[in-house]
Regions:
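A short, polar/proline- and glycine-enriched secondary-structure boundary/capping micro-motif
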Residues: 100-107, 126-132
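Short beta-strand-plus-loop segments that form exposed binding edges in beta-rich domains
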Residues: 119-123
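Short beta-strand/loop motifs in extracellular/secreted proteins, especially
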Residues: 56-58, 74, 127-131
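Extracellular repetitive beta-rich solenoid segments
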Residues: 1-22, 51-58, 64-72, 81-85, ...
Length: 139
């Protein structure tokens, strides 16, 4: 499919898979990634999407890694409710794993129909944090 490249010669083979956002044959699935520099208690938006009455539920799988040796993986369930610009989203974190320290609390904020996934760093967490995530939407 699109974004998949396989190459090689002799005993060496390489497969490259490049993530893409929604659309195509699976519009309910998207990926994202990046990094942010933080201090404790700072909230950073790590993903946004338009919510509408057709999207009832979104599930995120999130991975965070901090330059100070902390890692975190978890799920976040986002339930959408309402219509038009009055949409509301509720979120629940679960399956939280981390070592040795939790990096952030993950939540959502809705403004003018845009749902923002946020990471609020925990006490003692500073520096560059890298994240990757996937989002699966259900209508």
């Amino acid at each position: 499919g699109s974004g998949v490249v396989a190459s090689g010669s002799g005993a060496t083979k390489t497969i490259t898979i490049a993530g893409g956002g929604g659309g195509g044959t699976n519009p309910g699935f998207s990926t994202a990634g990046g990094n942010f520099t933080v201090n404790a208690g700072v909230t950073t938006v790590i993903d946004t999407f338009n919510i509408n009455t057709n999207t009832k539920l979104s599930e995120y799988t999130v991975h965070l890694e901090n330059v100070n040796g902390n890692i975190q993986s978890q799920k976040v369930l986002v339930m959408n409710y309402g219509a038009g610009l009055g949409l509301t989203a509720y979120s629940s974190e679960y399956g939280i794993m981390f070592h040795p320290n939790q990096i952030a609390d993950i939540g959502v904020v809705v403004t003018a129909g845009i749902c923002s996934l946020t990471a609020t760093t925990k006490t003692g967490i500073t520096g560059i944090t890298t994240f990757s995530l996937t989002r699966q939407d259900q209508s």
